[in-house]
Amino acid sequence: MAMEVTQLLINAQSIDGTVRKHAEESLKQFQEQNLAGFLLSLAGELANDEKPVDSRKLAGLVLKNALDAKEQHRKYELVQRWLALDMSTKSQIRAFLLKTLSAPVPDVRSTASQVIAKVAGIELPQKQWPELIVSLLSNIHQLPAHVKQATLETLGYLCEEVSPDVVEQEHVNKILTAVVQGMNAAEGNTDVRLAATRALYMALGFAQANFNNDMERDYIMRVVCEATLSPEVKIRQAAFECLVSIASTYYEKLAHYMQDIFNITAKAVREDDESVALQAIEFWSSICDEEIDILEEYGGEFAGDSDVPCFYFTKQALPGLVPLLLETLLKQEEDQDLDEGAWNIAMAGGTCLGLVARAVGDDIVPHVMPFIEEKISKPDWREREAATYAFGSILEGPSADKLMAIVNAALTFMLNALTNDPSNHVKDTTAWTLGRIFEFLHGSTIETPIINQANCQQIITVLIQSMNDAPNVAEKACGALYFLAQGYEDIGPSSPLTPFFQEIIKSLLAVAHREDATESRLRTAAYEALNEVVRCSTDETSTMVLQLVPVIMMELHNTLEGEKLSLDEREKQNELQGLLCGCLQVIIQKLGSEPTKSKFMEYADQMMGLFLRVFGCRSATAHEEAMLAIGALAYAAGPNFAKYMPEFYKYLEMGLQNFEEYQVCAVTVGVVGDVCRALEDKILPYCDGIMTQLLKDLSSNQLHRSVKPPIFSCFGDIALAIGEDFDKYWRYSMPMLQSAAELSAHSAGADDEMTEYTNSLRNGILEAYSGIFQGFKNSAKTQLLIPFAPHILQFLDSIYMEKDMDEVVMKTAIGVLGDLADTLGSHVGGLIQQSVSSKEFLNECLSSEDHTIKEAAEWAKHAITRAISV
């Protein structure tokens, strides 16, 4: 088979489609019929220096893909399949992989490094292949340079794949020693130094104990800083990447090194290759991110007794750092204004300047204003654009008091520049800066309004005029209008935008119809601005919003009439459908209540027909937006929505079955909740189908985990809608809730993402319990719930004891305690009295500063008192 595998791998890369397809099918068949033989053949191919490079590289890639996948359920299957292989096969594959590290071909060695790391990622947590790290490190000093390079690369990938708690500290120390020695200037081979520097980047997460040791930390930092001065660009870049990672991982250990780091970052930004300079700027962005997080967590003024101290590195560096960043703003590229994906030193510098402003607040203003004042009127467009970019970058962070006078003085100048500056670059940045002014310094919370009767008309006229400019400028003008409208969100019965409403709407629709509207996200920006203008409008303009309904409906209708379209045209059309459905959703929410409801509902049948047709277009984005619009329509229509259910139900079911496009599934679950609230017990005929599908979704390991919390919430919505009729589902739903509750109560998040997910899961479970209790209240069937009370109280106690719940969970949890007492009364009085929740947790909520938590707790306290006193 060996010869045949070589040929199949070569054929699988053939330009002849028939040959390629046949080879791919044969490889797939081999894999399905004899997995062990298949993997062994691939590893043998990869390790054989006599085989063609192309077949070896593909063998490694196929082998890697047989061990890992992006989708969690698929990854789990592949891991189980590997673990099920007999030990002899696995040992032979491992031996082949380790042998390949000494192959003369760099690409082949690199592929083997990645595959070894994938195997380690599966086996080390299972306490298998314990000798791997020792065998990689055993004679690293005696190895030829190319093998040393491959070994270091393998160690780097291994650290990326494996969790730090899986590797013993003794092995971690040895890995770091080998890596740091490989980085040392004494190492003569450039490839080895580069591999070592990249490996350190991946191994930093393992170095906690080493960074706690002063001598070891000093040594690592010295070697990294020396590597930033290497003659090789790639090594310098990789060394700065290490510093960026150290800034976020070991911020609190950096004080001793900051002066040296400032000097080397400044030198790199001013003199080095752009790829290196970008990383040097990124170091300061990371420092700012850390300090912003610390200061936000401790409410602005940092308290000295906190876990992570704030060292104010950014504030101390201001006199040197700000001039350095301002210099970068002058290094624009000629066409960056036309390239949406552009990223260069000027953009990185501006982004970092914005983070500095957020980290230090008012202190940045005197450091930046002289630069702005000097350059804002210069003949060279670069200087004008840099000054404008600097101004826009510091608008978030400093207080309104500090900025107000400056912004008031600059506003007229900015409006003139947007109209008259000859440079597209300058106009682009000016429109963006105006958007930032309206985002951060305009709104009901600002004492002295920037926009007043005197300048409102000029601002709107200039923005509307700029919507006819080049697509990139027009897109930013739409963005500025978006924030202008948003600032009037809580304006009351009368809005300063009312006199201009019709003109604004007309102009935005005209922009959306421009022939070049698909450039620079222009069409999307126009509809986003239109939505915000509608959302923040007042009753004064409701007639005009109503007139918009048939216009948008006709646009949506036209997208559904298209004849045969090319792939590109179809994609643009689907995007437009999504935007139009999103626009209709905002209009429904605006007009779907009195006094406009009755007039608006005349369009409901036509609108529903259009949304159902959108489902036929098979575009996930449009599908999501149409589904959300239907949710809004259900809320507006209330019980009358029942007439749409016979036709809509099949699409609802399709959405719940859509595991692939899980966002569609998540949105559909939310819409089930909307429909339940609208129809109440009229949803009953559809509940068997909906509950069956929701239970299937929960049992599936193919569905993205983020959809599962809203499914639990949806149980609550259904129970609340159908009341005691939910009894036919509780025997299936309650055990599922119980097992999910046990899992979430004790899965304290290993990281922020896990904590967030755990809280989301707990909230979903609690919302389900809340809906079920409220749905069964005053029913003869409440006794069905009594056996679950001990478990629910235990769940509440355990999540309280974990001390990691967020405020949303806190409010829902105390609400469930009240619902349980309210619905089950004296049946559970004794149990409640024994729980931690009814004492410590309740008292904590009663003294909460969040009035919604406090109100929920007061209600729960009354319900508990009633349950105990009966």
UniProtKB/Swiss-Prot annotation:
An annotated GO BP: protein import into nucleus
Expression (tissue specificity): Expressed in roots, cotyledons, leaves, stems, petals, stamen, stigma, siliques, embryos and guard cells.
Phenotype of null mutants: Delayed development and flowering, reduced length of leaves, stems and siliques, increased sensitivity to abscisic acid (ABA) and increased drought tolerance.
Domain Importin N-terminal: start-end pairs: 23-103
SMART domains: IBN_N
HEAT repeat start and end residues: 4-33, 35-67, 87-126, 132-161, 172-204, 214-249, 255-304, 313-361, 365-395, 403-440, 456-492, 498-535, 542-588, 596-637, 642-679, 684-722, 730-776, 826-868
An annotated Gene Ontology molecular function: small GTPase binding
Keyword terms, alphabetized: Acetylation, Cytoplasm, Nucleus, Protein transport, Repeat, Stress response, Transport
GO cellular component: cytoplasm; nucleus
PANTHER family: IMPORTIN BETA
Family: Belongs to the importin beta family. Importin beta-1 subfamily.
Protein name as catalogued: Importin subunit beta-1
Organism: Arabidopsis thaliana
Gene from which this protein is expressed: KPNB1
